[in-house]
Amino acid sequence: MTSWAKPGQAVYLRENLSGETVQVGAFDPSLPGTANRMKSLPEGFTKLGIPALLRCAHLDTLWVTVDEVGYLESGMEGYQQAFRTLLENKQVAAVVRKQPLAFLQELCSRKDAFVVDLDDPFGKIGCVIMASGLGRRFGSNKLLADFGGEPMICRILDATEGIFRRRVVVTRHEEIARLCREREISVVLHSLPNRNDTVRLGLQGMEEMDRCLFAPADQPLLRRETVAALALVSKGSPYCWRLSCEGVPGSPVVFPEWTFEQLKNLPEGKGGGILLKKYPERLRTVNIRDGYELQD
C-alpha cells in the first residue's frame, strides 16, 4: 500500500499489487494551519483502503509494506481495525507519521513493534575502535597491512562511518593515528599496556552518550549494515548487545550507559567481556548470516 499527496490538491492511496488507486483526501482551505490541510474522504478508504488491507492479511507472503499511515487514517475507524487485523496476520513494515494522534501512538507502542525514528535512527551512541594491538601473532602491525588495496584499519573506519554521535580510535601506533586524523576521526594515542586501558581511554568524552559500541579494528569483513543493525536494536535498550552467528558470539559489542563506570574500572588486562559473563541475563544478540564478518 502506498499513499502520497499532491500539495494543495489531494491525497491518493494505491494498492501496489493491483495498481488500483483512489482518492482518500481532499484539500480544504478552511482547515487551520498552512500545510497538510487535507480532509478525509471516507468513501476512498471504504472502496479500496479497507478491502486492500484485509486482502493483504491473507496473502501467501510474510511481509506487507504500508507507506504511509498518518492523520487521515487516524480518523477512519474501519481502516484502523483492518490495519489491526493485518498486524495480527503479517509482519508489517510501515511508515508512520510522527504526530500525537491516538492510532499512530498505538501502532508505535505495540510490544511487537520495532520503531526506527527516521529523524534520529541511531540516537546517542558512541563508538570506540580498539586499534592498540601489538601484532605479535601477525609479525607486524596487521592493521597497516594491505587489504583490498588499502590498510586494513580503513575497513573498520568505513564500516562505522555515519552512524555514531562520537567516534574515537584508541591506538598505540602513530601511523594509524595519522591515517585517522587524515579522515578527521578522533584519536587517542597512548603507550599503556593493557586492554582495560584501551577501554577506559575510549570512554573518555562519551559522557553524553547513552551507550557505546566497542569494535576491534581487525575484522575487515565486518559490514556497515551489520554495525548499523547493532546501533538500531540497542537504541533505548537496557541490554548489552553483540553479534552472533550460529550460536557463536563475536564482536562488536554495545554496552549501555549503566555499564560505563564498571568499564572504566576493569581489572588489569581484562576487557568488557568480563561484564558479559557477570550479567548474562542482560545480554542480547543480533544473529548474522555470514560468520566471516566475525573473523579477525
Where on the chain are the PLM-derived regions?
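Conserved alpha/beta core of the MobA/IspD/sugar-nucleotide pyrophosphorylase nucleotidyltransferase superfamily
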Residues: 261-296
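Residues in the short beta-alpha loop(s) of Rossmann-like NAD(P)-binding domains
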Residues: 4, 98, 150, 171-175
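Conserved beta-loop-beta/alpha segment of the NTase-like Rossmann-fold superfamily
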Residues: 193-261
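Internal catalytic-core helix/loop-beta-alpha segment
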Residues: 33-69, 73-75, 203, 224, ...
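N-terminal phosphate/diphosphate-binding loop that engages ATP/GTP or pyrophosphate donors
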Residues: 1-37
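N-terminal glycine-rich phosphate-binding loop and ensuing alpha1 helix
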Residues: 125-172
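Conserved N-terminal catalytic core of the sugar/cofactor nucleotidyltransferase
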Residues: 154-213, 225
